Regions:
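A structural signal for isolated positions on well-ordered beta-strands in alpha/beta enzyme cores
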Residues: 7, 33-35, 107, 129, ...
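Nucleotide donor/acceptor-binding cores
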Residues: 2-4, 78, 152
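Short, charged/polar "capping" segments at the starts of alpha-helices
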Residues: 42-45, 116-117, 164-165
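NAD(P)+-binding Rossmann beta1-loop-alpha1 motif at the extreme N-terminus of oxidoreductases
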Residues: 1-56
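Glycine-rich beta-alpha junction loops
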Residues: 41, 111-113, 132-137, 160, ...
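Rossmann-like NAD(P)(H) cofactor-binding subdomain of soluble oxidoreductases
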Residues: 59-144
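Residues at the C-termini of beta-strands that transition into short coil/loop
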Residues: 38, 57, 69-71, 110, ...
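Internal alpha-helical scaffold of NAD(P)-dependent oxidoreductase catalytic cores
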Residues: 98-99, 121-127, 142-217
């Protein structure tokens, strides 16, 4: 069985945590090769020292098979996790075309209801699974990700996609010690996340304060 090839684009708070956990579990094994697509000082730090994840009192160091800002150095992958900001999506997808082959599944972990549609506007017919995460994390410095939430969750899926392939990815993520879910109705979870962030954004804008200070009141 050929190794799976999995790429994470955007190694920040979200991509750094999920990409780091998957790389920590699978890098150097016969199961999968993990690739990071990053840029700037963050990429430089990962190349020099690997990725450091601070998980409470525990620290994990890991490194991908390759960290690069040039997707052409990677080539087509089986699964591509897009973890950039929503406003960078179109530019990011254009840059990622060298890692997107006919069999590549794109899983965007971005907030928004129209992410799949926006990707299909650029790549008609490409297989895209919807995704969302619940996590408290941040990039504290180049090459260092801190997860400060007690629990994280990742949801992904596509009701029209091959179920065996979705189960394959679910098992892979769970084996990486992630709280992963492949629900029958992924749209329900996308809407729940949208309502949550919309409410939070409204409150923080109204009070002109970060969410922790709003909640404290």
């Amino acid at each position: 069985m050929a190794k799976l090839r999995i790429a994470f684009s955007g190694i920040g708070a979200v991509g750094g945590y999920y990409g780091g956990m998957v790389a920590a579990r699978y890098q150097g094994t016969i199961k999968a090769d993990i690739f990071f697509i990053a840029r700037g000082e963050n990429l430089k730090a990962i190349r020099e020292k690997g990725l450091q994840m601070q998980l409470g009192i525990r620290t994990i160091h890991t490194a991908p098979a390759l960290a690069t800002d040039n997707p052409a150095e990677i080539g087509p992958v089986d699964y591509l996790f897009c973890c950039t900001k929503s406003y960078d999506l179109e530019e990011n997808i254009q840059q990622l075309k060298p890692v997107i082959g006919p069999e590549t599944v794109i899983i965007p972990l971005l907030n928004g209801l129209d992410i799949e549609e926006r990707i299909h506007n650029i790549l008609p017919g490409q297989e895209v699974w919807k995704g969302c995460v619940y996590i408290g994390s941040r990039l504290t410095e180049p090459g260092v990700v801190e997860k400060f939430s007690l629990k994280e969750r990742i949801f992904f899926g596509n009701k029209d996609a091959n179920k065996d392939k979705q189960t394959e990815l679910l098992k892979l993520l769970m084996y990486a010690r992630l709280n992963a879910f492949n629900p029958a109705d992924i749209d329900l979870h996308i809407w729940k996340k949208f309502f949550m962030i919309s409410t939070a954004a409204t409150a923080t804008s109204f009070f002109n304060q970060p969410i922790d200070e709003v909640l404290a009141q």
